């Protein structure tokens, strides 16, 4: 890449970054937080944060990258995607009408809400316990990170339930919403994330998500400022780099440490070059249609229920890894959101996907606002826990693609909804047995005096 070519790419990158950052800033000033703000920051991180890192790798370490015209296509496709997404998100689908009382879809009380977070936490802890009994601490047993996907590891399906510890702790926080509950959320979820990091063998997702939710709650409540958020972001990048070194068993120093930091940080937070690689091989792609979305559900079907279930699921990430890159190392390489759309239907699917994503984020913001307006604090805690708990799925959306997002968000909704139903059923059984006693002012006063 020549300096002239880099200059042209830099101008496009700067214009796209300023365009998205400006719209995000205006939205932040208007509402302080919603899921449009979160997705916009996530989109910036995924598709634009990596460009400066790539530039340093090219000019400082002479690392080979895709041709400049392909990198330009990647930047422009990301910028155009966001423009279509933003217009879709801001388009009002129906006329604003005055709020009229409606019969609520469901209600929550204190006992049902507490039962819900206990069940969610129980699912996570029991899953971790069973996985640990089968495999021990994989971080200290395996020689390479790719081995966690091998046949040596049993009970892999249990990992999908680990994440429900975070929604459980979110319910606990939203029931109190003070600084102590906020700090308790951070300590409990990060400690759990570190535990799963050691047990699973290097998976950092729970730590990243817990830290991100903690920061956004702090921004919403005004407990941290923007400069504190930026400082925490830098700390998070350094922390993720250190965990990556431990995961891959690397011991580096000097120039090698700087080089390793650049490419690991780029691959962790901003795999935009994967989109460029996909576009570089555009003519070799056999468009998959909506099949990757259907195939991604295969992993949730037990083998005893479907004996002939394919052992290898050809979703967009695996198609990109195996068919496009011819990489069979055992690790799936993230195609990114836009890359998954290209795999499914080529360039035509990019604006269509942007419209779909705009509607998805719009729905989450509608649900979030519903929680903000809810007068029943127990129901509000459940709604907010569901919305913030889905942040993991939005990260999957930006990094892994639309197919991975759809299967995971459906799984999340089913498990979360099942926990709600079980909590309500248990409450009904306890109430029928006479074990539930309503609190009265006199009993509360007696407890305080006693």
Curated annotation (Swiss-Prot):
Recorded superkingdom: Bacteria
InterPro entries, per database record: WzyE
What does it do? Probably involved in the polymerization of enterobacterial common antigen (ECA) trisaccharide repeat units.
Q: Which gene is annotated as encoding this protein in its UniProt record?
A: wzyE
What is the official name of this protein in its record? Probable ECA polymerase
User: What topology does the record note for this protein and the membrane?
Assistant: Multi-pass membrane protein
Source organism of the structure? Escherichia coli O139:H28 (strain E24377A / ETEC)
* Keywords recorded for this protein, A-Z: Cell inner membrane, Cell membrane, Membrane, Transmembrane, Transmembrane helix
Where is the organism placed in the taxonomic lineage, from the top? Answer: Bacteria, Pseudomonadati, Pseudomonadota, Gammaproteobacteria, Enterobacterales
Location(s), subcellular: Cell inner membrane
The answer to keyword Cell membrane applying to this record is yes
One CC-aspect GO term: plasma membrane
**Family listed:** Belongs to the WzyE family.
Pathway listed for it is:
Bacterial outer membrane biogenesis; enterobacterial common antigen biosynthesis
What parts of the sequence cross the membrane? 6-26, 37-57, 63-83, 118-138, 155-175, 181-201, 207-227, 228-248, 341-361, 378-398, 410-430
Per the record, the GO terms for biological process are:
enterobacterial common antigen biosynthetic process
